[in-house]
């Protein structure tokens, strides 16, 4: 996740928001207040490539559009959750100039609340 996603939780006392997962925060100037959170101060693309070479499950990206845009070349699967209400505006999934990227719908689930979860894979 990016620093902008991580810091609001820290201000509320949540220093390890995903304690069941390996946690990484991309930031050039952050010192982690929690030993379970790793800070990536270098190139996030190279860090993700290194993580992808490690054994284990996938990588889940939580955060804003700038980090997602920088990592788009490394994103193999995109999971979008659509909620049945209109907010008016919000944070974009990808922020900045990105190359057109073709995806194929791999799965759709509709929850009892009416929310839908769409999973897309790279073509």
Which positions does each model-derived feature cover?
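Enzymes that bind and transform nitrogen-containing heteroaromatic metabolites
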Residues: 1-123
């Amino acid at each position: 996740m990016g620093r902008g996603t991580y810091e609001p939780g820290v201000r509320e006392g949540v220093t390890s928001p995903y304690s069941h997962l390996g946690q990484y925060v991309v930031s050039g100037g952050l010192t982690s207040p929690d030993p379970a959170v790793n800070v990536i101060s270098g190139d996030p693309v190279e860090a993700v490539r290194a993580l992808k070479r490690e054994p284990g499950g996938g990588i889940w990206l939580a955060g804003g559009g700038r980090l997602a845009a920088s990592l788009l070349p490394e994103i193999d699967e995109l999971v979008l959750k659509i909620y049945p209400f209109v907010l008016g505006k919000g944070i974009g999934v990808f922020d900045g100039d990105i190359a057109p990227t073709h995806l194929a719908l791999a799965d759709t689930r509709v929850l009892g609340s009416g929310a839908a979860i769409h999973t897309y894979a790279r073509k």
